[in-house]
């Protein structure tokens, strides 16, 4: 009996609860009048076969082609909305995966800032719809407080889980939606008119996938000619247009992110303390080139570019393994799931950072750290060739070991040259005011659709 139950649970994991129940019902209905003992003898079930064979024969396992196609990428399943008459004030809904701790950095924080500023400027209500977990309002409160944003109306939160969990959320006829990924855009497009959607795109998301179904679905959304696009940085905007997305040029605009001095700034340092080298370490985000970064750091240590008598290495990110450098003689410090305040404090105490990103977007850590007074070494990619227009404390190298080692050597030299490093910091061209960053975006929301 226990083996039968285990097989049932395995079938459920593979095909889902709905398909399991449907399979049982269909087989039972067809065979309910069969005489006892008429089921054919069958050999012992192979491990990969479903337990349903035991009860209903060997022709089990057929699934709906439509359901299989829909289940392949469940995150793009349509939002389950019901329409209600438009109310006052009007509402703007931000659709994202999560706003909880561990998700607030970079792109998610930017989406909340943008949505809040648009709601503030248009006197609209803000609603945040999350898909992977219920929202913790504290996440939004931290962002709004950090950047001094005040909303007139109470923020609403709704949970629209991916999968079979039943839910329905209301939707105004004139509601505007800000989506934050190709999958949240696909889910929203399936439920509302395309003219009500603005897609905040902060990376070439096609690069998340090998060529296949997911890549193709993503490319379909990025090529949509009926929705508006807001692109994070001109670099990414130019790349997307040049890569065959003229609709982004026609229906899109770009903004440059901001790094207010109240948050990102150099901190006071203890005299005589070793300098700090930060490595942005995310082994499960493959575009951050975690393993190449380890190789690069080990080579820099072996060649004397990074002297561990003078430098401490700090690994910051997520799911970081326990690592020792220099043939096991040096144990690096690991920091994970930092709060926004802790992250800003860390950035302000960093001298040199290695931040790799195998995509056209510069990513946030190089900007966060340069805005906090650090020197940053990062890589070139496509049209991302030179980031000195943001800060001369950002050094780019080609993704070859020798080129990146040369960039590391330049980074160490600059980080230890207090005068030049300070001059570069004082002449940073990074934005410092989110309202200025999103001024044109807000104007677009204030205008007619």
What residue spans do the PLM features occupy?
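Acidic anion/phosphate-binding donor-loop and adjacent secondary structure
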Residues: 71-74, 78-81, 206-213, 253-274
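Conserved catalytic-core segment of nucleotide-activated headgroup transferases in glycan assembly
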Residues: 107-110, 127, 237-340
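Short hydrophobic beta-strand element within catalytic cores of glycosyltransferases
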Residues: 375-379
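Membrane-proximal helix-turn-helix segments that form the acceptor-binding/catalytic region
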Residues: 166-172, 212-230
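A charged, aromatic-enriched C-terminal amphipathic alpha-helix characteristic of glycosyltransferases
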Residues: 399, 413-449
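A short, active-site helix/loop in glycosyltransferases that binds the activated sugar's phosphate group
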Residues: 187-188, 208-209, 225-250
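Aromatic "clamp/platform" in nucleotide-sugar-dependent glycosyltransferases that forms part
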Residues: 357-358
């Amino acid at each position: 009996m226990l083996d039968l139950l285990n097989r049932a649970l395995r079938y459920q994991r593979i095909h889902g609860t709905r398909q399991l129940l449907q399979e049982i019902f269909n087989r039972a209905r067809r065979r309910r009048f069969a005489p006892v003992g008429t089921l054919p003898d069958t050999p012992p079930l192979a491990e990969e076969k479903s337990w349903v064979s035991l009860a209903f024969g060997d022709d089990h396992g057929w699934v709906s082609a439509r359901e299989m196609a829909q289940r392949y990428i469940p995150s793009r399943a349509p939002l389950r909305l019901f329409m209600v008459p438009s109310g006052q004030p009007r509402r703007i809904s931000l659709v994202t995966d999560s706003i909880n701790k561990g998700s607030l950095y970079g792109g998610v924080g930017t989406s909340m800032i943008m949505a809040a500023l648009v709601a503030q400027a248009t006197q609209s209500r803000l609603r945040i719809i999350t898909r992977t977990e219920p929202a913790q309002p504290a996440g939004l409160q931290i962002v709004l407080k950090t950047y001094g944003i005040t909303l007139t109306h109470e923020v609403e939160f709704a949970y629209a889980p991916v999968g079979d969990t039943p839910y329905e959320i209301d939707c105004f006829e004139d509601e505007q939606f800000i989506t934050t990924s190709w999958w949240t855009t696909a889910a929203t497009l399936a439920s509302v008119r395309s003219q009500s959607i603005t897609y905040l795109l902060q990376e070439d998301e096609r690069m998340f996938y090998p060529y296949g179904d997911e890549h193709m679905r993503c490319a379909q959304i990025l090529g949509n000619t009926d929705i508006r696009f807001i692109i994070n940085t001109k670099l990414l905007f130019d790349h997307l247009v040049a890569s065959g997305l003229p609709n982004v040029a026609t229906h899109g605009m770009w903004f440059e992110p901001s790094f207010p001095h109240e948050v990102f700034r150099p901190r006071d340092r203890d005299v005589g303390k070793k300098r700090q080298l930060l490595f942005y370490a995310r082994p499960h985000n493959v575009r951050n080139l975690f393993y190449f970064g380890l190789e690069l750091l080990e080579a820099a240590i072996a060649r004397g570019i990074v002297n561990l008598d003078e430098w401490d290495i700090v690994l910051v990110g997520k799911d970081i393994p326990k690592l020792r450098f220099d043939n096991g003689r040096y144990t690096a410090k690991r920091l994970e799931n930092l709060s926004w305040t802790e992250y800003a404090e860390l950035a302000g105490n960093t001298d040199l950072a290695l931040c790799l990103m195998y995509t056209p977007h510069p990513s946030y850590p190089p900007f966060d750290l340069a805005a906090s007074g650090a020197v940053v070494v990062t890589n070139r990619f496509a049209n991302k060739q030179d980031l000195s227009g943001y800060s001369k404390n950002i050094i780019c190298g080609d993704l070859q070991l020798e080129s990146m080692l040369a960039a590391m050597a330049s980074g160490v030299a600059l980080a230890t040259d207090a005068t030049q490093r300070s001059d570069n910091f004082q002449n940073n061209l990074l934005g410092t005011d989110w309202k200025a960053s999103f001024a044109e975006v807000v104007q677009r929301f204030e205008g007619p659709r």
